[in-house]
Amino acid sequence: MNLSFPQFNRAMVTALSLLLVSFSSLADRTITDQLGRQVTIPDHVNRVVVLQHQTLNLLVQLDAIDDVVGIQSSWKKQLGPEFARFSSRLSTLPMPGDLTQVNIESLLAEHPQVVFVANYAPQEMINQIEKAGIPVVAVSLRRDSQGEQDKLNPKMGNEEQAYNLGLQDGIRLVAKVVNREPQGEALIDYTFAQREKVTQRLKDIPESQRVRVYMANPDLTTYGSGKYTGLMMKHAGAMNVAAASIKGYKQVSIEQVLAWNPQVIFVQDRYPDEINKIRNDPAWQSIDAVKNQRVYLMPEYAKAWGYPMPEALAIGELWMAKKLYPARFTDIDINKAANDYYQRFYRTSWVPEPHASVE
């Protein structure tokens, strides 16, 4: 076949364009994870294994669950069995590892392009995955100083800055890996705009008049300073009774709780049995929160975890603030606020849990 010069040029341009598209799909890019590591990943990622539940939650909200080919074995324990409703795929996905261990054969069977891990994943685990030729991206949702990035209970000069900037960094990192940058920015913008509305309503409350709050976990464990939980309380207008003497996540004694005498006690939704234990145990009856029936089970979105989640900032802090200062939030329908968030980022309706204190 004879081609004229213009036809030949067009054919060459078409061929080169196809080659460029082909090579671009195989090209690499370098990102920096939240351990400060330079990680080279494919230009287009659509097969990831997620061995950290916070990152799995973010991927669902970024509308990237279809890119997930494997998840951690404890995801139901960490996120709650109700989390499965956000995608029918969740209950069918392989589970080649967990927060601190991996089955390398099972992992390789899923052919992932990237594996997400927690910042405290053992170095041996990271090395094992990387030696198999798979890039590892660590997520902490904190902005830490040098030498603190891989710690579960890091030293922090400024908790507010560490978690606020760290959450934004983490969302942007995860969104960048799975090519969902616009969704990541939308999630950040909405989260912090909603939080600011709560801040404005509570800004005139003096520290000395803040409600004394205790976060009750099983076996008398609680969160002190250095965790997002304390910041959640602060932004909701509370004073965390454990913050002054406890760092991180630790067990305390009933005598210590009695001495703190919290006015309100919160329990995370994943520990519903703790509510009746506290309400019915004679040892707790002299505490103000129990006497005044201010012991509340939190809804699933009010994640008072050590690590921040966007829904906790956007609507969880609002829920907590409304419980602590109802007169300041009489115009707020918390279920509507929750539904707005769920429709926007989970693409489903918020259904109040029958056991949680959602009103």
Predicted feature residues:
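Extracytoplasmic substrate-binding proteins
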Residues: 38, 125, 130-217, 221, ...
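Bacterial N-terminal signal peptides that target proteins for export
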Residues: 2-13
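Proline-aspartate-enriched helix->loop->beta-strand connector
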Residues: 96-99, 103-120, 253-270
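Alpha-helical, coiled-coil/dimerization segments enriched in small aliphatic residues
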Residues: 76, 228-249, 253
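Structural recognition of the beta-strand scaffold that forms the well-ordered cores
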Residues: 49-51, 69-72, 114-118, 136-140, ...
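A short, structured surface patch at a secondary-structure boundary
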Residues: 50, 56-108, 114, 137-142, ...
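N-terminal signal peptide c-region/cleavage motif recognized by signal peptidases
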Residues: 22-24
